[in-house]
Amino acid sequence: MRGLLYLALAIVSEVFGSTMLKLSEGFTQAWPIAGVIVGFLSAFTFLSFSLKTIDLSSAYATWSGVGTALTAIVGFLLFGETISLKGVFGLTLVIAGVVVLNQSKAHAEDKKQTACE
């Protein structure tokens, strides 16, 4: 359970860092630059903590997939960026891929545990 908390914090930190990257205007604004550094440093720190209990493939796929989707939503909501129907479809596929990967890992773990009993 702690691994999932760290993974969620890694995702939020990465989205924060990406948002600050946009606000830094090409690394010309001091406070957003500090936000980029804090955001990405926190993201990788929390991701590394999550890897103590979550498989690398699941953690990284979830981090990158959910982070990508949330960053697109932040871009839409905060910066007025557009998301085309194809873009929505692509983000849906990314999220579906993360879900399928995590379900297959859970299924494999269940089989492994049943075999040991």
From Swiss-Prot:
Gene3D superfamilies: 1.10.3730.20. GO terms for molecular function: transmembrane transporter activity. It is a multi-pass membrane protein. The chain crosses the membrane at residues 3-23, 31-51, 59-79, 81-101. GO terms for cellular component: plasma membrane. One of its GO terms (biological process) is transmembrane transport. It is found in: Cell membrane. Keywords: Cell membrane, Membrane, Transmembrane, Transmembrane helix, Transport. InterPro entries: Small_drug/metabolite_transptr, Small_multidrug_res. Pfam families: Multi_Drug_Res (PF00893). Belongs to the drug/metabolite transporter (DMT) superfamily. Small multidrug resistance (SMR) (TC 2.A.7.1) family. EbrA/EbrB subfamily. The efflux pump is composed of EbrA and EbrB. Part of a multidrug efflux pump. Confers resistance to cationic lipophilic dyes such as ethidium bromide, acriflavine, pyronine Y and safranin O. The efflux is probably coupled to an influx of protons. This is Multidrug resistance protein EbrB. It comes from Bacillus subtilis (strain 168).
